[in-house]
């Protein structure tokens, strides 16, 4: 009898299923969404634009919009914001409305706001000048005091040397004068002796 080979199993073994990783992939630093730049504050740009105008009657709304557009502000999208900012600044007393009513008309800075801007500019210019000058005056004062202290000792020896010369000169004059006086005294003493001798001889002759 012929041997029969065992039949191959028809059942298939299922392949292992990979489980999805529970860890979330971290975002790359380069792909982080860039933040939108903050918009310009209209309440600050409007006073700056009005400070540049030299018109006494103020700046009209159309001219103000041109100045804001030149500064990089989107006037068309933010038209309503400009009008609201103008009303707020007028109510606060920062701006004065010279013509028109509401947001339409001409505007200019009030005296208080103008004086505040001038003071700020003066402080900035003073600080810039101080930086250009370099060291402050307080740091320069020790150098001047050192130079004065060095000059004073030099002046004192000159006075002492002058006085020394005067004393030496006076002593030399006295020494020179003293021999002359001695010589002048010696002849007088010799004459006195001769007179005494003559008187003695006369007396002796008279006695004889």
From Swiss-Prot:
Polar residues composition-biased segments: 1-12
Gene Ontology biological process terms in this record: binding of sperm to zona pellucida; cell differentiation; flagellated sperm motility; nucleosome assembly; spermatogenesis
Tissue expression remark: Testis-specific.
Alphabetized SMART domains for the sequence: H15 (SM00526)
The keyword Zinc is annotated on this UniProt entry: no
Superkingdom of origin organism: Eukaryota
Domain H15: 38-111
Residue(s) carrying Phosphothreonine: 156
Citrulline carried by residues: 56
Positions where Phosphoserine occurs in the chain: 9, 141, 163, 178
Biased composition (Basic and acidic residues): 199-208
Assigned GO CC terms: condensed nuclear chromosome; nucleosome
PTM comment, free text: Phosphorylated in early spermatids.
Cited CDD domains: H15
Keywords: Chromosome, Citrullination, Developmental protein, Differentiation, DNA-binding, Nucleus, Phosphoprotein, Spermatogenesis
Region of interest (Disordered), residue spans: 1-39, 95-208
Family matches, as InterPro entries: H1/H5, Histone_H1/H5_H15, WH-like_DNA-bd_sf, WH_DNA-bd_sf
Bias-annotated ranges (Basic residues): 121-134, 143-154
Site positions per UniProt: Important for nucleosome binding properties: 54
Transmembrane segments: none
Biological function: Testis-specific histone H1 that forms less compacted chromatin compared to other H1 histone subtypes. Formation of more relaxed chromatin may be required to promote chromatin architecture required for proper chromosome regulation during meiosis, such as homologous recombination. Histones H1 act as linkers that bind to nucleosomes and compact polynucleosomes into a higher-order chromatin configuration.
UniProt family annotation: Belongs to the histone H1/H5 family.
Name of the molecule in the record: Histone H1t
The species this protein was found in: Mus musculus
């Amino acid at each position: 009898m012929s041997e029969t080979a065992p039949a191959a199993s028809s059942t298939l073994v299922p392949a292992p299923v990979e489980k999805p990783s529970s860890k979330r992939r971290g975002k790359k630093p380069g792909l982080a969404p860039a933040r939108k730049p903050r918009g310009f504050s209209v309440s600050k740009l409007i006073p700056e634009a009005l400070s540049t105008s030299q018109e006494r009657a103020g700046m009209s709304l159309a001219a103000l919009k041109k100045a804001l557009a030149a500064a990089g502000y989107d006037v068309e999208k933010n038209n309503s914001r400009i009008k609201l900012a103008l009303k707020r600044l007028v109510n606060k007393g920062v701006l004065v409305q010279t013509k028109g009513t509401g947001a339409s008309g001409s505007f200019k800075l009030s005296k208080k706001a103008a004086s505040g801007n001038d003071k700020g500019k003066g402080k900035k210019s003073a600080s810039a000048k101080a930086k250009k000058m370099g060291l402050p005056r307080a740091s320069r004062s020790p150098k001047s005091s050192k130079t004065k202290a060095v000059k004073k000792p030099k002046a004192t020896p000159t006075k002492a040397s002058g006085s020394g010369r005067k004393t030496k000169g006076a002593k030399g004059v006295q020494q020179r004068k003293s021999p002359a006086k001695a010589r002048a005294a010696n002849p007088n003493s010799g004459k006195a002796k001769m007179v005494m001798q003559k008187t003695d001889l006369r007396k002796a002759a008279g006695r004889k």
